[in-house]
């Protein structure tokens, strides 16, 4: 018998479990590649201050869950508890936003560490897959990331989940909301746990985010962020919901959804598994938009949006699915248009080719000249270019250009929609 055992909250992967793990990793990397994402890897540990500043010192992640240690130079380091902060640090340090076409679309698959009570789908060492879209305020990407996450679950034949969304305002408006929450919760202190009573002062948003407290009527009736949104923010949220409706992505608005990290300042969303295997209520995908994180990390004043997937939870959710995970590597297509009025049609075609044709497709969300389109296509490593031009579109046609052979032809829309991997 071995004298040594693995630490609590960790697992050994081998044989079939390892095969399933690697298959899922390859599936996720391949699927997001079709949306134009490039992989990035960052160190397994960072200076602790990075996570304290990004996640917020009052967050559970920082105050309770981080693995902290000092190195031989007496500097505080932390094992990575989540993926976004390290990616943003790498992007800023290596000036990736200044040396690449924007938006910058990155994906990662990394081990993370949190000191939590182990249970189904929750380990102290776990793996997180995530994507980040950096350097754009265009809310199309809010929609695109939700559509991507939804597509991942659909392709895995996972159906036991609900999508919840909310909109978190700017730091100023959020501070007004926090003050209102503090005044409200102080009236009902006795109905809250001792921990929540402390959070009234430190960060009342954590009360809303607490899985047990959020079930209480007094918490459900707390002031909502919607009362503090500007008209512009309300219009933006309405537009995101309209895009989801147009693409038949089902969702429900949860005004108590705030996520567990302090850097969100726009759309937030969670795909919540309802599988009994995950105790009936477990977030498998979560993310949102962040307006100040890049700047706070020392970079330019750019926004970003991203999401993370808990791999161990997703593997458990897959037990309810008999879908085989396939790994396909193929040519990359790029869609462009010359007229702004064709933008919505280009978006629809992009989504159709990704979902129905299983193609690796990205889109240029701007009307630029042909020579710039070709240069950008080369930098994005696209092999084929689909162009929507007004004259051809009136005849239900598009232009297909092979960027390797430079062969160009005009095809009917029906022919394009028959292209396979």
Swiss-Prot record:
It catalyses: tRNA(His) + L-histidine + ATP = L-histidyl-tRNA(His) + AMP + diphosphate + H(+). The keyword Nucleotide-binding applies. Its main location: cytoplasm. Its EC number is 6.1.1.21. SUPFAM superfamilies: Class II aaRS ABD-related, Class II aaRS and biotin synthetases. GO terms for molecular function: ATP binding; histidine-tRNA ligase activity. It comes from the Bacteria. Keywords: Aminoacyl-tRNA synthetase, ATP-binding, Cytoplasm, Ligase, Nucleotide-binding, Protein biosynthesis. GO terms for biological process: histidyl-tRNA aminoacylation. PROSITE patterns: AA_TRNA_LIGASE_II. The keyword ATP-binding applies. InterPro entries: aa-tRNA-synth_II (IPR006195), aa-tRNA-synth_II/BPL/LPL (IPR045864), Anticodon-bd_dom_sf (IPR036621), His-tRNA-ligase (IPR015807), HisRS-like_core (IPR041715), HisRS/HisZ (IPR004516). One of its GO terms (cellular component) is cytoplasm. It is found in: Cytoplasm. Homodimer. NCBIfam families: hisS (TIGR00442). Belongs to the class-II aminoacyl-tRNA synthetase family. This is Histidine--tRNA ligase. It comes from Ureaplasma urealyticum serovar 10 (strain ATCC 33699 / Western). The gene is hisS.
